[in-house]
A protein has these predicted regions:
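Active-site helical microenvironments for divalent-metal-assisted chemistry
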Residues: 1-195
């Protein structure tokens, strides 16, 4: 029983070239497929796996409300990013809690929503995953070698607690790299090296 949330769009990397892609274009040169909330729901249904759609929809609605009015550098509504990360997580066959955490992964970091709010609404499992993804993002470093070593340490630590945290973070980075064409050249290079 899906309510009709506000339709938003998200970019998700297509596995095949779109029909309108220039001949000979590399996958990295083609704009990712546009996915709406409705298409995400269709993909969940088409997966043939049982998902807690009430939880996933509730996570979408909270993320959509929390990020309302915020746009990415590309000009797209910010909700596009969490939707795209959730689609990548779905495509990997992950569970309802992982999809909900993917939708919520930037809410604590970027909005007034707290981990206590997430725990109250979604339980400690989802809140702990969101917290783990947030912690993987927070530390800043002065040089790339230190950053890469710390990223590896943080990934291993996250894996030891819950491998889903690392997978959500990797999906987050993957989507950011695929849609980073709006970033300045130096930021794209830095993110690529950091990842």
């Amino acid at each position: 029983h899906l309510h009709q949330p506000v339709q938003e769009t998200a970019t998700v990397a297509a596995t095949a070239q779109p029909a309108d892609a220039p001949e000979g274009a590399l996958p990295s040169e083609v704009r990712p497929e546009i996915v709406t909330w409705e298409k995400l729901c269709e993909a969940i249904k088409a997966s043939g796996r049982a998902y807690d759609m009430d939880m996933i929809e509730k996570a979408y609605n909270l993320a959509n409300d929390a990020h309302k009015g915020v746009c990415r550098r590309s000009g797209e509504p910010y909700i596009c990013h969490p939707l795209a990360v959730a689609r990548l997580v779905l495509d990997l066959g992950m569970d309802s809690e992982s999809i909900a955490a993917a939708l919520l992964h930037d809410v604590v970091e970027d909005t007034p929503t707290t981990l206590d709010d997430l725990t109250a609404q979604f339980g400690s499992e989802v809140a702990q995953m969101v917290d783990g993804v947030t912690k993987l993002t927070k530390i800043q470093f002065s040089n790339i070698e230190e950053l890469q070593a710390e990223n590896l340490r943080k990934m291993l630590l996250a894996m030891s607690r819950d491998v889903r945290v690392m997978i959500i973070k990797l999906c987050d980075r993957l989507h950011n790299m695929r849609t980073g064409d709006a970033w300045p050249e130096q930021k794209r290079r830095d993110k690529a090296r950091e990842t």
